[in-house]
Amino acid sequence: MNFLFRLFSARTLLTIIFLSTGFARPASTRQTPQPTAIELSKKETVASAFLRSMAFQEYQVRSAAEAMPEELYTYRPAEGKFKDQKPEFGPAEMRTFAEQVKHVACANFGFASELNGDKPPEGCDKGGPDPAKTKRELLIYLRNSFAVIRKSFTAINAKNQFDPIEGPYAGPNTRMGLAVVVVWHNADHYGQMVIYLRLNGIVPPASRPSPPPVKDTY
């Protein structure tokens, strides 16, 4: 997944910085008093900082996946097929919505494996080895991937944050560097999923006046 770095545009970087500062939050949390910077500085850890950012990304991605009707999981923007596309710039045809969901889930599992020192699943760029296909199966796969990455994040601390991480997905890297990639990778694909929803007249849950909670079971 080294090609991801070539896709990491300035716009994506600004988005991640904006999100990580806490200025952008789901509408459902805007009325909840947020801790001050001083309060955070007294209790914040490396793990909690990443977990806070990841919680927002998890809500965005999972709620978007839930909002898309199953019959539109095969939807692919018609303008997403490019002629004379260079292979090194990625596939010539945009993913279907289902492929977006599956890619994010597989990538989360892959990143978690690398953070844990395990072998990651192969072929996440093309969906990976998991057989999930229906909307329900993909939602479960996606939900489980976030649970796994959260667990991996909890193991990051001040002593190991700069430990070397090898692997095909965003490697070589450090533990902290890879955690940053995990957050922006989810934000990147959420931005694409939003377009799919909007093109079908669906307002992303995170953008609604009263965002609904994500489901625990499917």
Regions found by a protein language model. Name each.
Residues 10-22:
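Bacterial N-terminal signal peptides
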Residues 66-75, 152-162, 198-205:
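Surface-exposed helix-capping loop/turn segments at secondary-structure junctions
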Residues 47, 51, 55-62, 74-126, ...:
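Short, contiguous alpha-helical
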Residues 130-166, 174-188:
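Acidic/histidine-rich alpha-helical segments that form the ligand environment
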Residues 1-13:
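Bacterial N-terminal signal peptides that target proteins for export
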Residues 56, 60-63, 67, 148-155, ...:
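Solvent-exposed, charged/polar functional surfaces in cytosolic regulatory/catalytic domains
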Residues 31-47:
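N-terminal low-complexity, Pro/Thr/Ser-rich intrinsically disordered segments
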